Each structure stands twice: as C-alpha cells, then as structure tokens.
Amino acid sequence: MSQPRLDELLGTLTHELRSPLVTIVSAAQLIANERDMKPSVRRALAVMERQSRQALRIIDDLFDTCAGTEGKLSLRKEVIGLADIVAAATETASHLLASRQHRLTVSLPPGPVFLEGDLLRLVQVLTNLLSNAAKFTDPGGHIRLTARVEAGQVVLRVRDDGRGIDPDLLPRVFDLFHQLPGPAAQKTGGLGIGLALVKSLVELHGGSVSARSDGPGTGAEFVVRLPVRADGSC
C-alpha cells in the first residue's frame, strides 16, 4: 500500500473509531451521576471511562501525526513563555511520574524566555517526552528536564537513567508505529505513536528533535531545539 493511501486509511480509521469512543465516555459520565448505584458498578464505569479516554488519546495522537506528516495540521501561533510550557507539561505528567515514584529535576535559564508557537502543541511535545522517559525508567528513577538558550534556539533536554536504547536502533525511534524490541519494552504498552508525533510537531515549529543513548542500561536523552523569539521577549 502506498504511503498516501495508508495515510488516508489511517485518517478514516481514526475518525470512525473516535466517534463511538466519545459516545462511550459521555454515556459513562451520565450513568455515573445516578445516585442509587452499587459501588461495584460505579467502579466498573470509572474503569470504562478511563480506558475509553486512554484509547481516545491514542487515536487523537495518531490523527495528529498523520495530519502533521501531510502538512494538514494547523498551529495556533502566539508568544509563549518557556516557563509556562514547562510548568504545564510537568503538571500534566506529574501523575505518571508519581505513580512510578520518579524524581523529576527541572532546570530553566534565568530570566524570561519566549517562543512563538502553539502552546497546547508544545506542551504536548514535552509531556510526551516526559511520559516516555517515565515509562522506560524503572520505578524510583531520576528524570532531568533542562532548558537552555543556545545560538538563538531554545534547547530542551529530557534525560532519564532508564533502560537505554541500542545505538543501532536510534535512527528509528521517531518512526510511526516503531517500538523497541524485547519484553521489557513491550511491558510499557503503547503503539509507537508518541515520539512520531513529537517529531512532527517540533518540525512544524521549525525545530528539530534527536535522541541519544550509549546503549541498554545507560538511560536516554531526547533533545528538542526550537527557534527562540527574535527579540527574546513578548
């Protein structure tokens, strides 16, 4: 199947799958508002809603990745503070980090730094990288998020002390549907969409993303480079 045909098929599938899932989430919320309900039924509804929302996030990520690859994903450009992006992303990822007992260290440059881009999409980029680091790091790990301004670019680094990546596999980590081999990677779940979406969104912002690792057991680092606002302010 040709790539354009595959992209069209994926776009159709995501649309067809999303509609019934939205209905399931809405129905679960509506039923959960009923007062006279057994605790076991309420718990089952909560699980149903949570799993449906998780599936929706996967579908939305897939749709956005396909749209970005085709140049059909629009961005809402505005002036954004780097600190706002980091704060929103760390808050979004906080539940996953806490559930795995990870320690997160954040280091930002002194003074305000501004970018021009889509706030929600840039938060999504950083959240995906933090979530990826959390999933591939054993419980109780240390994840570092650092931001610097270098040569007119904002450089964001997400470093973990997790399972690491075979250097031979690094060129493919951003490929759509690519998953690292081995049982340890399979335990994390996912479909290999998150990093592909990161690459697509970063490139739409005129930036680049790369990954490095010295091999299994050495952790991994993902580096995002984005243009800083020319005057450095809003």
Each model region followed by its residue ranges:
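Primarily the dimerization/phosphotransfer
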Residues: 1-30
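Short alpha-helical segment of the dimerization/phosphotransfer core of two-component systems
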Residues: 50-55
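Conserved micro-motifs of the catalytic ATP-binding
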Residues: 70-75, 114-117
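Conserved catalytic submotifs in the C-terminal HATPase_c
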Residues: 76-81, 98, 103-113
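Short conserved segment of the HATPase_c
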Residues: 165-179
